[in-house]
Amino acid sequence: MQKALKLGSFFARSAISVKPTLATSKMTQLRHFSHGASVFDIDSVEDFTEKVIQSSVPVIVDFHAEWCGPCQALGPRLEEKVNGRQGSVLLAKINVDHAGELAMDYGISAVPTVFAFKNGEKISGFSGVLDDEQLDDFIEDVLAA
C-alpha cells in the first residue's frame, strides 16, 4: 500500500549529502515564503522542540530533500491539504540535508517520510507518496487521535 523510496541510512553514514549552493539557498528562501500560514520550515532541534513538540495543535512533519522526486510530488499536495484545514493542523517541513541531526534522531532512512505529532508525541506516520484520498484519511486520523 505504501511505496517508499529506499535510500539506506544515508544520513548516519554520510553516504549522500547535498551541499547547499547559492542557487539552492535562494530556492529554499523563495519556497519558504510561499508556504501558507499553517506551513513552516524547521532548521534545528530547538526549532523542532518549540514548533512541533510544544505545539497546542497537531503537527505533521515532512522529512524531505530537494533532490528527491517523490518529495517534490508529495510536498505541495500535503501543503495544500494542510492549508485547507484553517490551522486545525500544522505542517513542519524538514530538509534532511540541512537538518541531519533531526533526521538521525527520528531514524529517517527514506524520503519522503512523514510523521504526525500530537501533544508532543509521535502518533503515526508513513514513508513514500500517498494518493489524495490516502492523504485526506491520514490527516483525518491525525485530527481524530
Curated annotation (Swiss-Prot):
Coiled coil feature spans: none
PROSITE patterns: THIOREDOXIN_1, THIOREDOXIN_2
Keywords from the UniProt entry: Disulfide bond, Electron transport, Redox-active center, Transport
Pfam family, one: Thioredoxin
Lineage: superkingdom: Eukaryota
InterPro entries: Thioredoxin-like_sf, Thioredoxin_CS, Thioredoxin_domain
S-S pairs: 68-71
Domain Thioredoxin, first and last residues per copy: 39-144
Sites annotated Deprotonates C-terminal active site Cys: 62
Catalytic residues (UniProt): 68, 71
One GO cellular component, as annotated: mitochondrion
GO biological process entries: cell redox homeostasis
Residues carrying the site annotation Contributes to redox potential value: 69-70
Job of this protein: Participates in various redox reactions through the reversible oxidation of its active center dithiol to a disulfide and catalyzes dithiol-disulfide exchange reactions.
Family: Belongs to the thioredoxin family.
Protein name per Swiss-Prot or TrEMBL: Probable thioredoxin-2
Organism: Caenorhabditis elegans
Gene responsible for this protein: trx-2
